[in-house]
Amino acid sequence: MDEVPSSDGSKSACSGEVVMEQSVHELEEVFKKFDANGDGKISGSELADILRSLGSDVGEAEVKAMMEEADADGDGYVSLQEFVDLNNKGASVKDLKNAFKVFDRDCNGSISAAELCHTLESVGEPCTIEESKNIIHNVDKNGDGLISVEEFQTMMTSEMTDKSK
């Protein structure tokens, strides 16, 4: 685990923004395929049709459950924004877990100050152990001096939320 994978999202904010823009564009293209009548929203029947055309034997109850999960505003349709949000929610959890693995060099399920500092230095961010300890202190909910997967996810998602404001 000495290399930092290029697709883990742990690069600079600028490269992450480019990846996000590309994936939103790709999701728009997929959305257009689901939106058979071009009205800017996906209905339950459009979802069922596309899933069946892809070989999935989905029943009405499954389609209804999928629609309920995706339809955040409860209008009975999935808008482009709801579609993007749904897809990014699943991807971001996976991406965050992959990013966590990059930092968790000894694979023990937590990130120490030394691991944090080493990983930051490996991507060109100057760092001291003291700085790493301060970062950890700010997100360490249970006070063990380490960052758990949950604490890492909280830290990263609150950073993303702060940057979008």
UniProtKB/Swiss-Prot annotation:
It comes from the Eukaryota. Pfam families: EF-hand_7. Ca(2+) 3 binds at residues 104, 106, 108, 110, 115. Keywords: Allergen, Calcium, Metal-binding, Repeat. Residues 22-57, 58-86, 91-126, 127-162 form the EF-hand domain. Ca(2+) 4 binds at residues 140, 142, 144, 151. Disulfide bonds: none annotated. The keyword Cytoplasm does not apply. InterPro entries: EF-hand-dom_pair, EF_Hand_1_Ca_BS, EF_hand_dom, EF_hand_pair_protein_CML-like. GO terms for molecular function: calcium ion binding. Ca(2+) 2 binds at residues 71, 73, 75, 77, 82. SMART domains: EFh. Ca(2+) 1 binds at residues 35, 37, 39, 41, 46. Signal peptide: none annotated. This is Polcalcin Jun o 2.
